[in-house]
Amino acid sequence: MNWKKIMAVGLAAVSMMAFVSGCGSDTKKADTQLPKKIVIGLDDSFPPMGFKDDKGEIVGLDIDLAKEAAKRAGMDVEFKAIDWSSKEAELKSKKIDVLWNGLTVSPEREKNILFSDTYMKDKQYIVVRNDDNAIKGKSDLASKVVGVQQASTGESALQNDPSGKTVKEVKSYADFVSAFMDLGIGRVDAVIADGVIARYLMTKEPGKYKIVEGTDYGVDNFAVGFRKDDTALRDKINSILAEMKKDGTADKIVEKWLGSSADLDKSDAK
């Protein structure tokens, strides 16, 4: 073997070592990009996803999912109540690191938020008092007062649907609990709400409210929200959520709060 061949073999070996070393460095770099603690922003009046219990502690379906995910990622987690209508500003200003609270994916939100894979699916429904037989469909909202949560998917759904053009008034609330209270006493005629929260609140006051069947405003995909450049954190949470769906942990958490895991999206559980 002449010296040119020796040099070629040597350079190839060095290049291979550099490649392997580089891969190791990239992996290590990706790991170090993950924070030791994450602050999760949420609306703490959004049962059963996240809310304060009788002791003033923040609990809920998303809280349990987030705690388990953070545990598996080796991170500490803090839950911070925020003004939900300012959620994107809170995330961008780094007052919080993550949005995890029944957050629906939408093209408008995708402009400012990096979303995880979908972990649950839901729909927006018309909810009325149980004794109200006048509202049987979207067209019956004409000349009615309708309640929505401010900056919610339900608010957007009503605004973008023809039925929203015929209502008498749209009343925006800081949270769904307040909207349902006003529905109960007749201040509004209907509320546009997520099926998950509607069914949960209906179980707390049996016989008081009902969902108007066949009035959904399309399917909502629940996902976790991150800053646009937090791809490493997003990818880690995606991986962990897929594991939780595969090993049954996610099913148990959803069943605990909803009685069934039918709304859980397992398309990424491999």
Cite the ranges covered by each PLM segment:
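Extended ligand-binding regions for polar small-molecule ligands
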Residues: 24, 63-72, 132, 139, ...
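Ligand-binding clefts/hinges and TM-proximal coupling segments of bilobed small-molecule sensing domains
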Residues: 25-30, 153-171, 210-213, 242-270
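Extracytoplasmic small-molecule ligand-binding "clamshell" domains
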Residues: 30-102, 236, 247
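Periplasmic-binding protein-like
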Residues: 44, 121-128, 199, 203-238, ...
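Ligand-binding cleft/hinge of the Venus flytrap
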Residues: 52, 66-75, 154-173, 202-206
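Short helix-initiation/N-cap motifs at beta->coil->alpha
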Residues: 63, 79-91, 133, 170-185
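Acidic, polar ligand-binding/catalytic clefts
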Residues: 67, 76-140
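A ligand-binding cleft/hinge motif common to bilobed small-molecule-binding domains
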Residues: 103-111, 159-160, 182-185, 189-218
